[in-house]
């Protein structure tokens, strides 16, 4: 799995994706000195209330597409493939909770990647999923919205914390931040979803969390 190809961008304003292996993303988070410098400066400027300077550092950090691969852009029309990955974002966690949340998500067998976000107060999670019953006519964008909701509800229950629902779009990018303790599990267990059951479950669902395995 470490050779899975992903689309990475030099920064949030970049529109030309570069294909890299998943293990290169992990290496950047763990070892890249330029990313470490941006992360340190962002946290310093933010602590001093210098929002513009902090935003400049964040915008300069690389970011990668979690759910899809892109070609020649980063719009929905530029999607060239699907990774089988989804994202959970726990940002601005209550004081002292980030370490606890990180430990819980790292211990879960579904977690492929977990790292502390650039704020230093959040945790980003990447996990795998499989779709049973998929056909060439399957609407992958609609399916991803369903997958995202179920996966995020699962991790929300696991941690007892709120997730960011704004990350539901398949084209959403995940910004990198330096984390020497980044967690990576090559053989992570995928969530499995049956497409027909998932569609049927959507209509009657009203605040009920569906069990996923």
Regions found by a protein language model. Give the residues of each.
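Short, charge-rich binding segments
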Residues: 77-80, 104-106, 114-116
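Hydrophobic, Leu/Ile/Phe/Ala-enriched alpha-helical segments that form helix-helix packing faces
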Residues: 42-52, 105-109, 151-159
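Short beta-strand
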Residues: 113-119, 164-169
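Short, conserved phosphate-binding/catalytic loop or strand-edge motifs used
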Residues: 117-128
